A protein has these predicted regions:
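Short, basic alpha-helical nucleic acid-contact segments in DNA-binding proteins
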Residues: 6-8, 15-37
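Mobile genetic element proteins and their domesticated derivatives, centered on retroelements
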Residues: 13, 42, 58, 63, ...
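Active-site beta-loop-alpha junctions of metal-dependent nucleic acid enzymes
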Residues: 19, 68-90
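Two-metal-ion RNase H-like nuclease active-site motif
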Residues: 35-48
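A short, conserved beta-strand element enriched in hydrophobic/aromatic residues
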Residues: 55-74
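Helix-centered, glycine/charged polyanion-binding patches within enzymatic domains
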Residues: 101-156, 160, 166-167, 172-175
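C-terminal domain-tail junction helix/linker
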Residues: 141-143, 152-215
Length: 215
């Protein structure tokens, strides 16, 4: 925008994120290649408006976020609700599920995915625990979330963008990383164009008006 001489306020960007963020995230999820067959699941405390909430998050063996859900409880009913979201997001049932020893996970596992391996061994769930760190950083930067709806919208949208650029830099060469990053950037720019969020102004009336001779 700045390169085109367009001045935008912070409030405009915030309103655009509210309006177009969920649509943008849905488009990215459709383009995603799918998740792995091992889910690492964990929940953390999040305080919103003085009330305690639980942020449930699941990542696969590649570090991609499979699902994020904010709930008031962490009982068996809440666990089953989160597991159902994960099954809708993935193309098939996971081969292995790694959690801590919270009993709610056992309830959801027995009723929804009994054929999957349920691993509750110590230190096995470190990947899910580490995935909460970026959320804590953003939570401090935003001076805590203002509402559950805002938190759910922000975290779901950010997860879709994170998956797009989670390329596994430590596993590939610099040449391949540049190629994959270029593809991710092209997709990131292409999705807003398809949604009508961004319209390149080369042929817009503004540009035509600027080039019209003055009378």
């Amino acid at each position: 925008m700045a390169e085109r001489g367009i001045r935008i306020s912070y409030e405009s960007i915030r309103l655009w994120c509210i309006k177009f963020g969920p649509k943008y995230a849905r488009r990215l999820r459709r383009r995603h290649n799918g998740c792995g067959d091992t889910f690492f699941i964990d929940e953390v405390f999040v305080k919103i408006q003085g009330r305690q909430h639980y942020l449930w998050r699941a990542v696969d063996q590649d570090g991609d976020v499979v699902g994020v859900l904010l709930q008031r409880r962490r009982d068996g009913k809440a666990a089953k609700r989160f597991f159902k979201q994960l099954l809708r997001a993935s193309s098939s049932e996971p081969r292995r599920i790694v959690t801590d020893k919270l009993r709610s996970y056992g309830v959801a596992h027995r009723e929804l995915v009994p054929d999957s391996i349920h691993d509750t061994s110590q230190y096995a769930n470190y990947r899910a625990e580490l995935s909460h760190q970026p959320t804590r950083v953003r939570e401090r930067g935003m001076r805590r979330f203002k509402s559950t709806h805002q938190a759910q919208r922000f975290l779901s949208t950010h997860a879709a963008v994170y998956n797009l650029f989670n390329l596994g830099r430590h596993l590939i060469s610099a040449q391949h990383y540049r190629v994959f990053r270029a593809r991710s950037l092209a997709l990131a720019y292409n999705v807003p164009l398809r949604l009508g969020i961004v319209r390149w102004p080369n042929k817009s009336r503004i540009y035509r008006k600027l080039h019209e001779p003055r009378s």
